[in-house]
A protein has these predicted regions:
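Short glycine-enriched nucleophile-adjacent loop
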Residues: 31-42, 47
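Alpha/beta-hydrolase active-site loop
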Residues: 1-17
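Active-site nucleophile loop of the alpha/beta-hydrolase fold
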Residues: 48-58
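Alpha/beta-hydrolase fold nucleophile elbow
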Residues: 16-27
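The feature captures the conserved acid-bearing segment of alpha/beta-hydrolase catalytic domains
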Residues: 59-120
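C-terminal catalytic histidine-bearing segment of alpha/beta-hydrolase fold enzymes
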Residues: 122, 129-166
Length: 166
């Protein structure tokens, strides 16, 4: 919650400084924050969400890099209860707000991601498409962490730059 509040405050500061086109970009967990900011702040024109997914609970439950978190939850909470508790953090809860006409959304996902499984990302994409979101989806044949390495980081940077500058 605090990250979204802080992000919205930064948008107000940028607007007071004269900026009229506001974009947000986030990678991995930061893409959830950027998506939540875009969903809740109508001043955002573009959102570039890299390595994102819609269901944070499922990402923690199924992602290989999240095993230690999952282990701490085992026997204490079921996935359905975690989903309910974390619903305010799930981008899938805000598909309608992300589908507003004045917002363009880019999603870049890694087809071999073991942190945010492609099924988690693709379900968000399907829901956004179903809601009529202005959506640009890019799929790279890499994993979550290899996105930060050449040539993927170069390709990703160029795609995000093109999207945000148009």
């Amino acid at each position: 919650r605090q990250a979204v509040v802080d992000g919205r405050q930064l948008i107000k500061i940028a607007q007071r400084a004269g900026y009229r086109k506001i974009s947000v970009l986030g990678i991995s967990l930061g893409s959830w924050v950027a998506g939540l900011i875009a969903a809740h702040d109508p001043a955002v024109d573009k959102a570039s969400l890299l390595l994102t997914g819609g269901d944070l609970a499922e990402m923690v439950w199924t992602g290989g890099a999240m095993r230690h978190i999952r282990a701490s939850l085992d026997g204490k909470i079921e996935l359905s209860d975690l989903r309910r508790a974390w619903a305010p953090l799930n981008l899938e809860s805000y598909v309608g707000k992300l589908a507003r006409p004045a917002l363009d959304v880019q999603i870049l996902l890694a087809t071999r991601d073991r942190v945010v499984l492609p099924t988690v990302s693709e379900r968000l994409v399907q829901r956004l498409e179903g809601a009529g979101t202005s959506l640009n989806v890019e799929r790279l044949n890499c994993g979550h962490y290899s996105l930060t390495l050449p040539p993927y980081i170069i390709t990703t940077g160029m795609r995000a730059s093109r999207f945000l500058s148009r």
